[in-house]
Amino acid sequence: MSDLFRGAPSDMTAGHPTTRNLTSAPDAPPAEPTGPISATYPGQADQPAGVVAYGPDIPTEAQYRLLGNVADKRVLQLGCGSGAEATALAGQGARVVAVDPSLHRIEVARGTIERAEVKVELHQSDLAELPFVRADSIDLAVSVYALANVDDLDRVFRQVHRVLHPESVFVFSLPHPAYAMLDPDGGDPPAVIRSYFDRGSRPWFTDTDQGEERIRTISELHTSLARTNFRVDAIIEAEPTDTSPSPFWTTAMRWAPATLIIRARKEGI
């Protein structure tokens, strides 16, 4: 499913179906949504306007400057979130193609685009299936936390490599594997509840979606990028900002970076 959507002023908001019934019994109250940050960020985050935010409570693209000038560039966004990143990029003159497997997130992004009155091409699709994007047609690829919910990351990387121009940049953020070791609801200092080398996934669900977060070590990510012909040129273990904490803030963020940001460049053809 895809559409080319130009926002227009409207008092209407798009409706969305739930993916499934999450109640445990007909007469039971709905269970509380649960899961790691990647279950709700950036989709439920109150993000700064006009700039790409890579994670909660860390500096934005305005400080990191990983993307460069996006004006007149064709940008692929993997994972729509709330549509804030696509809107920010389109507002800076980029021609944005945004992809997400979730119909709900597509509808939320459409509403954000509508309010901002910008133009974004939306596709509902698996992140590893991009038949609607021609080879060597993308100038820049971006993803914020969405790859945490991907099972076969190499497959996604191969697709991104296919559609990027040679030497073009791919910037993405993920949960930092060190932060995943800590109890976010624990004390100060937080307790270690998971091995750094634990490859197990962490299931999550919200009112509209569900999935499994997969934590990957930095070496695993670097190896996956190398074998799909990407060259890593920046790794950022994001330190928290000194501003007022967001609803995503936990004490554990003072002890380990919650967000890992990687910039890689396409090599070869």
Feature map (PLM): residue ranges:
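A short glycine-rich, Lys/Arg-flanked "PGG" loop and its adjoining helix->strand segment in the class I
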Residues: D154-V169
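Short alpha-helix
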Residues: G211-I235
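A short SAM/SAH-binding and catalytic strip from SAM-dependent methyltransferases
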Residues: D139-D154
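Acceptor-substrate binding/catalytic loop of class I
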Residues: L174, A178, F205-E220
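Class I SAM-dependent methyltransferase SAM/SAH-binding core
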Residues: R74-E129
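Conserved class I S-adenosyl-L-methionine
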Residues: S2-A71, A84-A88, R105-V108, T112-R115, V169-P203
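A short acidic, Gly/Pro-enriched loop at the edge of an enzyme's catalytic core
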Residues: A128, F132-L140
